[in-house]
Regions:
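Short acidic N-proximal helix/loop "leader" segments that mark the beginning
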Residues: 1-9
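Short beta-edge strand/loop motif at the mouth of beta-sheet-based domains
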Residues: 9-10, 29-75, 154, 163
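Amphipathic alpha-helical segments
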Residues: 16-34
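A short, structured loop/turn motif at beta-sheet edges
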Residues: 17-19, 79-84, 101-109
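Hydrophobic pocket/interface hotspot
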Residues: 21-22, 31, 61-63, 78, ...
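Short beta-strand segments that buttress and anchor functional surface loops
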Residues: 61-66, 86-92
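Beta-strand/loop substructures that line and gate deep hydrophobic ligand-binding cavities in soluble
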Residues: 88-137, 153
Length: 165
């Protein structure tokens, strides 16, 4: 059977309430706490959502990362957001990402599925391998922060080629 380069799944257990884990994805404050330098969610009418306001399906986003200049920006759309345990967004040419929050064996889990990744050399290298590496790091950072640890992100734009930026 051939390897499926068009999707992958990354999951981690995190000792935090499920709603807090969902809010980490669905609010500006949440995303900027563990993931991004800037997360803007805009309603379909163009109004910016407040920092603690949940984004909804149909909203657009703008994301900037720590350790990267402002011209490294991601624009996309929120495809689904149920307010408690499922969040899906477009991720540019890299496909779509679905986030599922669930409980199993007494633990809360965050699971990301990235799919619709182009099955060509660029897609395999940059989006399958690159995004899987990135999501692995950022989920580790989420776990660190939500379990009382430190922020592992590189915030120095002068440092290049790091796994944590």
């Amino acid at each position: 059977m051939a390897f499926d380069w068009t999707s992958f799944i990354v999951r981690i257990n995190i000792n935090a309430p499920a709603q807090k884990l969902y809010d980490a994805w669905a609010t500006r404050d949440g995303m900027e706490h563990w993931f991004l330098r800037l997360s803007e969610y805009k309603k379909p009418d163009g109004d910016l959502r407040h920092n603690l306001e949940h984004t909804e399906a149909g909203d657009n986003y703008k994301w900037l990362w720590h350790g990267w200049p402002d011209d490294t920006v991601e624009y996309g759309k929120i495809l689904e957001a149920n307010g408690k345990d499922f969040f899906k967004f477009s991720f540019g040419k890299a496909g779509n990402c679905s986030v599922k929050i669930f409980r199993d064996i007494g633990e809360n889990f965050v699971e990301i599925t990235q799919d619709n990744i182009p099955d060509d050399d660029h897609g395999r290298t940059n989006w399958h391998l690159g995004c899987k590496t990135g999501w692995t790091f950022y989920l580790d950072n989420m776990k660190s922060l939500y379990e009382g640890g430190i922020d592992l992100r590189n915030k120095n734009i002068l440092l290049k080629g790091l796994v944590n930026a």
